[in-house]
């Protein structure tokens, strides 16, 4: 699996309520994203930063999603994002009470 950390600066005037509304507004976009397993919206209002943590099934799908058009969309909506891609070898899933590795994903 691939984890993508996306962060961007947000306007200091954005409140928690407004930011949550913006996140809920875009959430349906991700329901049919190829290869996306999960997306978590994140924020640090104290430092005017928000973003998302994405879990993709593979690097190809992650890179396809974060193409130039997607980066431009995020930039226009908030600000230019910073992206970091990570290989995810092992997951501890306490909901399902499983430990998942690359071998059994």
Language-model segments: residues:
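Short S/T/G/P-rich N-terminal loop/turn motif that feeds into the first structured element of a domain
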Residues: 1-49, 59-67, 84-105
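Conserved short beta-strand edge segments in small beta-sheet-based binding/regulatory domains
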Residues: 75-87
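RNA recognition motif
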Residues: 69-73
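Conserved RNP beta-strands of RNA recognition motif
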Residues: 52-56
């Amino acid at each position: 699996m691939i984890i993508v950390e996306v962060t961007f600066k947000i306007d200091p005037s954005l409140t928690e309520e407004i930011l949550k509304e913006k996140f809920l507004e875009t959430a349906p976009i991700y329901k049919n994203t190829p290869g996306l397993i999960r997306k978590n919206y994140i924020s640090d209002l104290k430092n005017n930063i928000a973003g998302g943590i994405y879990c993709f099934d593979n690097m190809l799908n992650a890179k396809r999603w974060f193409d130039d058009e997607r980066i431009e969309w995020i930039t226009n909506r908030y600000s230019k994002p910073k992206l970091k891609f990570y290989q995810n070898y092992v997951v501890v899933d306490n909901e399902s009470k499983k430990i998942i590795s690359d071998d059994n994903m």
